[in-house]
Amino acid sequence: MLKLLLPQHRTSVYLFKFQFFNFRFLSQSPSLSNSASSFSSSSLAEAILKCRSAEEAFKLFETSSRSRVSKSNDLQSFSAVIHVLTGAHKYTLARCLIKSLIERLKRHSEPSNMSHRLFNALEDIQSPKFSIGVFSLLIMEFLEMGLFEEALWVSREMKCSPDSKACLSILNGLVRRRRFDSVWVDYQLMISRGLVPDVHIYFVLFQCCFKQGLYSKKEKLLDEMTSLGIKPNVYIYTIYILDLCRDNKMEEAEKMFELMKKHGVLPNLYTYSAMIDGYCKTGNVRQAYGLYKEILVAELLPNVVVFGTLVDGFCKARELVTARSLFVHMVKFGVDPNLYVYNCLIHGHCKSGNMLEAVGLLSEMESLNLSPDVFTYTILINGLCIEDQVAEANRLFQKMKNERIFPSSATYNSLIHGYCKEYNMEQALDLCSEMTASGVEPNIITFSTLIDGYCNVRDIKAAMGLYFEMTIKGIVPDVVTYTALIDAHFKEANMKEALRLYSDMLEAGIHPNDHTFACLVDGFWKEGRLSVAIDFYQENNQQRSCWNHVGFTCLIEGLCQNGYILRASRFFSDMRSCGITPDICSYVSMLKGHLQEKRITDTMMLQCDMIKTGILPNLLVNQLLARFYQANGYVKSACFLTNSSRLKTVSNSC
């Protein structure tokens, strides 16, 4: 491989000499006349090629440059001296001449024509001093000047492969431009012309595989490297591991991680970071923390990326104390928590309902001169609205606007959802208008939230108005939109319109979810169409993922209230066979059915089953059972349940 860099002291001498020559040469008129010269049109190039040394050739070229020869002779003599200098390993001076020639030719022709002229001139040199290395130098100079397409054209036109450094630069340029198919075509072309790939070439190919998602291709490349006796370096192992972690293939990633250590390749911080990120994404935060300890043992300094990944992982695992303790480690290693780290911790506290702690972290950020961004405020506003603290959410909303942080659609949607939960539809609609005035277009989430809000306040007219408005604007309703409207129409005893919307939903290719099925079943039996509800279940019972405990409970409740306790029991059994654990409401529906039919044994067994499942009877359940036991002569059991000290009260009774 050509060594394109000379030692510093030699390079500086050539650069000084060339700059002096270049100034004198370029100061002449760009149009070269046919004035007298000591050489004829082609004799200068011939004389240069006949010189005994590169120094003599360059001196002759420099001296003759004072003469104003023709452009063709200029290009020919340049090509000759570049070949001579390259053959003498004077690469820096050769590249300086190539650069000067490119700049001269660019003034008078398009880059594509210029590259053709220059390539042909260099190729036309007929001499034993012809050096194939000039084309690699030409490629490198084109790349350095930002002329990638010209460099690529030269590499494809060459009769043999450029040197490995030029090939590496070409392939890397294609990867960076995401021209992945060209990477493999050009690589095969280079191989066919004599390129012997090295570990650096393979690293670029691994990068291409990673960005294309070609996992099987990486395995073939690794086998190819092994067959050529090329040892993968830490960067190749890291990108391999990174790809496995991205696809959640942690077992394979672990094997590769151990394999690299077995082969004497020490993981670097990026390798550890990839593994830690993979473990955190799959919820294995303990393994991730174990690798963090390995980093310390290996005497590597963890950076903010490693800490951010760990904080995010522990927050998602609801281990907020551990996540917070990592801040102490960050201080120890001189790593300043960044915005991402704080946003992760704030999000963790919001998901756990610790809004006081989350808002306190905002104040802590500001005390450290770390300005919150739109994500920080959106996380907090969403958390506050979930916890029904809409007034505090609005205060933060006004604060972020005062700080010139522009709310996103997610910010507006969170606050709109908060107002809808409070049934404050006027404020929600005003906020939607403000959203539009601010240049933020309402999206599917905005419309679905507003439609659901109006459905909850029984304003079906306003809900349908928004439904038509969103379709006019080209926003396609989703399953949430349709489910809210279907449920609302059933509650308004308008089954015909509910079924029309369900039909529209299916025609639009939108698959119903578990809430949709629950609304339909609930609507059918409450409209006195229990048989339709059962038929609907039987038609759709293959879609197990679309049935949850709510849908089954609605069906069970309908059957029990209509005296079909045996069929209800079968559905209760079906629910469990689907892997769905009954909740308190499911048990209440079944208990009411058994009590209504005075099925004492079944009632007792169901009560035991409920306790065995880990569901504590609430006040309603205890009262129902107490009255039933008392009416059937089980006084002790009734007294036990009515004893206030033994009542297990739950706020949400069914």
Curated annotation (Swiss-Prot):
PPR repeats: 37-71, 74-104, 131-161, 163-197, 198-232, 233-267, 268-302, 303-337, 338-372, 373-407, 408-442, 443-477, 478-512, 513-543, 548-582, 583-617
Coiled coil: none
The keyword Hydrolase is assigned to this record: no
Protein's UniProt keywords contain Repeat: yes
Matches recorded under InterPro entries: Pentatricopeptide_rpt, TPR-like_helical_dom_sf
Superkingdom of source: Eukaryota
Protein keywords: Repeat
Family according to the record: Belongs to the PPR family. P subfamily.
Record PANTHER family: PENTACOTRIPEPTIDE-REPEAT REGION OF PRORP DOMAIN-CONTAINING PROTEIN, RESPIRATORY COMPLEX I CHAPERONE (CIA84), PUTATIVE (AFU_ORTHOLOGUE AFUA_2G06020)-RELATED
Name of the protein in its database record: Pentatricopeptide repeat-containing protein At5g61400
